[in-house]
């Protein structure tokens, strides 16, 4: 890839240096110069619909849209002048022509970009004498409501639904001043209900059925946390409001966009927080008395459990006790649990719900440097191989990153799966192999042509298999992503294949901390760091006597 040279431009008398081809609006943002916009959104196609980003560029006959102009060396730009401010003021006046003045009851009030722009650039009075357009609010789905008069036709929602989510549930009907955002069905959305269209809307045209009329933004405390619904580890921000019963979670969003997920948040991260206050949630420990579980204090519960575990250990031995950990708890909690099991209870009978085989993955990578990739790497990797798993359902952020990479960088994506997964639409090459034959595919990639007999089908001919293998062998900087369908020797074979062509690897866990649970030693035969639970000395020197038999 040819190296991109830096160029220097002048913006409002200030020297700005950025790579050639950078959009002017981004070059300005990088040095703290604000250029307002509604329709522009990083990563989405350029629209130039709102005209709020108009700037004066020397030698240009008229004002230019900063969201579409790429910088060139020596360019001289003015972003603040009487001419520019008047143009922005006129745009605001046009947008407000039919926009209802219902800010006091609009859910976007206090977070509305149009409010902010009007405060900075808008006129105090309108010259329009005609009445505003009034239309009934529409409910497109359980979570998406549309208020047409509030819509400023920035098309962000249409683009993020189509380009970002690859759902294409929204479009534009009619033409010119009659244009209106509309769903892909007559009166309802047929989509994933991810809420990205609501999140990206700069005004209150799209609002959430889960949040409507519950509170005002300034009444909430915004608490950043990590979503626990899958292994992606997305940051989500919970809007928390004080109530008579304590603190209520009223909204989930991605307001600061500084987590690993950037702009993205799926339906689970955005809406699936009601379990926190569910009526069936245990809020106090229970102890069984006379055959019934009754509430008790934490002190009594801990004392009772400790006493019974000690009695069982002393009378029957540590091996009579089994400990089940969780792949949804933190590394610290998992580490302490397995240490408690081994050093206090004297048992290696500790495990968790295992799907992905991270132990085999660790063994296969032993001695290899820089062999693993991250989810963020999938945004820029030139080539990606996906074996098994359905990221759209199981790892939505990973799917979002792959789609973004294909759209912006034209990355090549090779997929082998037993199902017709949604990411197939982004695939350069796709093999639909029989279910449970992922290991045979890896053997074939390693040159075992006889394995092709177990893989061929109407959707994967022998020639297609060979072409798939040859295409992969020719890829540079390949990232191989595989799901829990591969285990043991199959993972070792995949690492052998990938290492031969300089690939990096990502092993996908099915739960929030599947990898951490394995790393921390929630395994019957391995200690933290995948050290054998038998015959080792280092941990015994630190922890004292440890059980030497493998757990169940």
Question: For the regions a protein language model found, what residue spans apply to each?
Answer:
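Conserved short loop/turn motifs at secondary-structure junctions
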Residues: 15, 38-43, 147-148, 180-189, ...
């Amino acid at each position: 890839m040819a190296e991109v040279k830096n160029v220097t431009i002048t913006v409002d008398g200030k020297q700005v240096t950025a790579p050639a081809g950078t959009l002017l609006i981004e070059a300005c943002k990088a040095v703290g110069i604000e250029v307002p916009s509604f329709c522009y959104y990083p990563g989405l196609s350029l629209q130039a619909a709102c005209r709020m980003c108009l700037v004066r560029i020397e030698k240009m006959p008229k004002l230019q849209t900063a969201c579409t102009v790429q910088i060139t060396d020596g360019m001289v730009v003015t972003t603040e002048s009487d001419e520019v401010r008047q143009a922005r003021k006129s745009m605001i006046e046009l947008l407000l022509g039919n926009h209802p003045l219902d800010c006091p009851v609009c859910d976007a009030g206090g977070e509305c970009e149009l409010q902010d722009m009007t405060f900075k650039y808008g006129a105090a009075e309108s010259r329009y004498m005609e009445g505003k357009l009034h239309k009934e609010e529409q409910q497109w789905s359980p979570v998406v409501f549309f208020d047409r008069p509030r819509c400023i036709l920035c098309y962000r929602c249409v683009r993020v639904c189509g380009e970002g989510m690859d759902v294409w549930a929204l479009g534009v009907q009619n033409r010119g001043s009659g244009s209106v955002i509309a769903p892909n069905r007559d009166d309802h959305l047929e989509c994933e209900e991810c809420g990205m269209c609501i999140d990206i809307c700069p005004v209150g045209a799209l609002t959430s059925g889960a949040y409507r009329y519950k509170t005002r933004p300034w009444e909430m405390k915004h608490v950043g946390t990590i979503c626990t619904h899958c292994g992606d580890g997305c940051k989500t921000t919970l809007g928390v409001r004080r109530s008579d019963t304590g603190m209520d979670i009223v909204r989930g969003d991605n307001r600061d966009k500084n987590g690993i997920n950037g702009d993205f948040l799926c339906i689970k991260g955005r809406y699936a927080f009601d379990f926190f206050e569910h009526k069936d949630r245990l809020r106090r420990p229970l102890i069984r008395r006379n055959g019934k579980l009754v509430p008790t204090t934490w002190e009594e519960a801990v004392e009772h459990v400790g006493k019974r575990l000690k009695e069982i250990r002393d009378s029957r031995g540590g091996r009579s006790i089994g400990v089940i950990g969780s792949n949804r708890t933190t590394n610290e909690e998992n580490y302490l649990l397995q240490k408690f099991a081994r050093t206090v209870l004297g048992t290696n009978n500790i495990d968790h719900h295992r799907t992905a085989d991270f132990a085999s993955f660790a063994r296969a990578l032993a001695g290899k440097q820089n062999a693993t990739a991250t989810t963020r790497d999938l945004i820029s990797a030139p080539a990606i191989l996906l074996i098994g798993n359905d990221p759209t359902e199981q790892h939505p952020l990973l799917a979002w990153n792959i789609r973004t990479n294909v759209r912006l960088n034209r990355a090549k994506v090779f997929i082998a799966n037993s199902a017709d997964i949604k990411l197939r639409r982004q695939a350069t090459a796709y093999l639909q192999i029989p279910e449970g034959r992922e290991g045979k595919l890896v053997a074939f990639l390693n040159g075992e042509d006889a394995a092709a007999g177990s893989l061929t089908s109407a959707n994967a001919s022998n020639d297609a298999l060979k072409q798939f293998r040859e295409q992969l062998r020719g890829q540079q900087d390949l990232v191989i992503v595989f799901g829990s369908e591969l285990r043991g020797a199959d993972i070792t074979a995949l690492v052998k294949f990938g290492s031969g062509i300089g690939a990096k690897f990502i092993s996908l866990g099915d739960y929030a901390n599947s990898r951490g649970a394995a790393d921390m030693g929630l395994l019957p035969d391995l200690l933290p760091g995948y050290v054998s639970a038998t015959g080792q000395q280092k941990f015994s020197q630190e922890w004292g006597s440890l059980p030497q038999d493998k757990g169940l």
